[in-house]
Regions:
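A short, charged, amphipathic alpha-helix used as a generic interaction element across diverse proteins
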Residues: 17, 21-43
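Short intrinsically disordered, low-complexity segments
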Residues: 8, 31-34, 48
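Surface-exposed loop/edge segments in extracytoplasmic proteins
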Residues: 13-19, 55-57
Length: 69
């Protein structure tokens, strides 16, 4: 089975998880759950890649700063 979306989670530049998702709604639900810096010491970065290769990024810093690209 082929996956259309990929959600990667990094804590302080270390890859800690990769999810492969089949459809938009599944990817959207997983992306919506990325809401804080988790177990990272400095920051957590979440990358969602769609079927066209476009990447969306959320970065949550321990100091409360949030950057979404």
């Amino acid at each position: 089975m082929e996956y259309a979306y990929s959600l990667s989670t990094y804590y302080d530049d270390e890859l800690v998880a990769v999810m492969r998702l089949h459809d938009f709604m599944e990817a959207h639900d997983a992306w919506a759950k990325c809401v804080d810096y988790g177990n990272a010491k400095v920051y957590a970065r979440y990358n969602l890649t769609d079927p066209t290769g476009k990447m969306y990024t959320k970065t949550f810093y321990a100091n409360g700063e949030v950057v979404i690209k």
